[in-house]
Amino acid sequence: MRNFAIGYVVLLAMSGTAFSETKEPPKKLAVDLGKGVKLEMVLIPAGDFKMGSGESAEATAAFFNKTYGGDLEAGLFKDEHPQHRVRITKPLYLGTHHVTRGQFRQFVKDSGYKTDSEKGENPGAYGWESDPKEFGINEKYSWRNAGFEQTDEHPVVNVSWNDVEAFCKWLSKKEGKTYRLPTEAEWEYACRAGTTTRYYSGDDPETLAKVGNVADATLKAKTPDRKYLTIKASDGYVFTAPVGNFKPNAFGFYDMHGNVWEWCADWYGAEYYATSPLDDPTGPDSGTDRVLRGGSWVGWPGHARSAARLRYWPVDRGYYSGFRVARTQ
């Protein structure tokens, strides 16, 4: 895999993915959320790439079963196929990091918003329990309390897709610009940043310890009684890590692999790739689940692959899911 200097890569909208080097750094944007709280974004150039897995579902399952002693079935990866060409026709801004607790706190203070875990007929969220038998929705958990220590520099968790949409609408109204979740295609394009390997760090899952926070030796040592499929290396964190602690990809984005799953705008469609349009796909017109990408601190290494997909109901919230925002240029 060719290595590119961060900030020196420009993706050209040509047949296949093409690159040329430039001395100009990526264009950044600092959005003022109020009270001195900033949200940094990076401009992604328009371009095209191959979306989905470059290896068969059978090969993916066989690799992880052999390498980590799993018992995974190929069907788990079928929705990553067929791999297909996608063209992102317009530049867009995307958050450099996950939205943090501090940034989300500013939204709540300014708007008075109550999250799905704090209202409704089914309040509460999933939180970390020392006894895995206690795992389940509990009213004591919300974005304010995930069951483990977090500072305002950590990614916010226990936010539903609905909560994230409310954040984007608030910011759009506040700034007079269109803030939103990235589409699934935009997310994978931003994550890959020109790479074609399982991760932007390469094909070896052990390289994740340098670029992201996933289920690892640190988590396994902390929870020896739990059966996690972990990498052998250590990323240094049991739970979530403060944003920006690992190496970014060539576009300048941090934590695209691991830390927290990221909500995307799309409805989930298991067979959508077979009919996906070339230009700016936005997913199925309707559905029951929304897409998440990127894996998490408690997720096995296969979930952190650039092509991996997850789905949850829009009201779901967990200690493993968060988001980053996009803005139309």
Positions of predicted regions on the chain:
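Functional-site microenvironments in short loops/helix caps that host divalent-cation chemistry
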Residues: 50, 54-59, 63-76, 114-310, ...
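Mature N-terminal segment immediately following signal peptide/propeptide cleavage
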Residues: 35-51
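Bacterial N-terminal signal peptides
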Residues: 7-15
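Positively charged n-region of N-terminal signal peptides that target proteins for export
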Residues: 1-4
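Short aromatic-glycine motifs in intrinsically disordered, low-complexity regions
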Residues: 26-39, 227-233
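Acidic-aromatic/histidine active-site loop/patch
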Residues: 100
